[in-house]
Amino acid sequence: MKHYEVLFILKPTLTEEEVNAKLEFVKEVLTKNSAEIETVVPMGTRKLAYKIKKYERGTYFVIYFKAPTNLIAELERVLRITEEVIRFLIVKYENKKEIAAWEKLSHGIKQSKKEIKPLDAPEIQ
């Protein structure tokens, strides 16, 4: 299994229940397709660098996971057709140095905080 990271941004107009439902939906897509989720990092609502689909803010999530390569096409398809996702990025960690960084990121985040809370980023004017 390969090491991956997916970052996705949800619309800021969603309620907390809808955000949690979309996060669970993405996690379900991963687990149903034999992925092992290492860490989920909710990064909170942040101002975007530029408008995306008329939105200036978005709710960010990062998921570190291990998965077979055939899962990525399905994950991309699901994220593209999900209206609430305004942008996403999937990163594959390939060489030993990158995998070591992935391990450090996924386990370091997990061990440093028992429950990860969203970051309150100050709004930039």
UniProtKB/Swiss-Prot annotation:
Keywords: Ribonucleoprotein, Ribosomal protein, RNA-binding, rRNA-binding. One of its GO terms (molecular function) is small ribosomal subunit rRNA binding. The keyword RNA-binding applies. GO terms for biological process: translation. InterPro entries: Ribosomal_bS6, Ribosomal_bS6_sf, Ribosomal_S6_plastid/chlpt, Transl_elong_EF1B/ribsomal_bS6. One of its GO terms (cellular component) is cytosolic small ribosomal subunit. It comes from the Bacteria. The keyword Ribosomal protein applies. Binds together with bS18 to 16S ribosomal RNA. Belongs to the bacterial ribosomal protein bS6 family. This is Small ribosomal subunit protein bS6. It comes from Campylobacter jejuni (strain RM1221).
